[in-house]
């Protein structure tokens, strides 16, 4: 997959979330795709990922992606590393944070996505021991 095709596929994936379009979402994924969320939870295959997509948007979560902006996009024919800014509303609360995804491609679709969320600076200092003299 060339850079243009990879970027187009990632843009379709993120737009499917902001537009709440499950058919477009599923069209970006391989039949046995794996999505690993920032919290470590995962879904596999079109049936499970479709149910996850639907449940995230439905009550009681009521999820709504308000923005998903790609800041940096690096790729080769098999994979991509992406930095992004994400905004959403869940359970009636708004959230926004930077993050990154590692994406593997197979036959023109997404085979796997592993998402990472950047921690707030205070949490990073505690986890790394920085700032604790």
Residues covered by each model-derived region:
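A solvent-exposed, acidic/Ser-Thr-rich amphipathic alpha-helical stretch
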Residues: 3-4, 22-26, 30-76
């Amino acid at each position: 997959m060339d850079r243009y095709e990879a970027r187009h596929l990632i843009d379709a994936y993120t737009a499917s979330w902001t537009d709440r379009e499950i058919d477009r979402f599923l069209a970006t994924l391989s039949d046995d795709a794996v999505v690993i969320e920032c919290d470590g939870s995962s879904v596999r295959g079109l049936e499970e990922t479709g149910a996850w997509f639907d449940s995230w948007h439905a009550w009681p979560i009521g999820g709504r992606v308000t923005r998903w902006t790609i800041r940096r996009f690096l790729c080769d024919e098999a994979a991509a590393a992406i930095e992004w800014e994400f905004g959403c509303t869940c359970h009636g609360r708004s959230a926004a944070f930077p993050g990154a995804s590692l994406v593997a491609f197979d036959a023109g679709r997404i085979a796997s996505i592993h998402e990472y969320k950047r921690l707030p600076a205070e949490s990073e200092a505690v986890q790394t021991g920085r700032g604790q003299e």
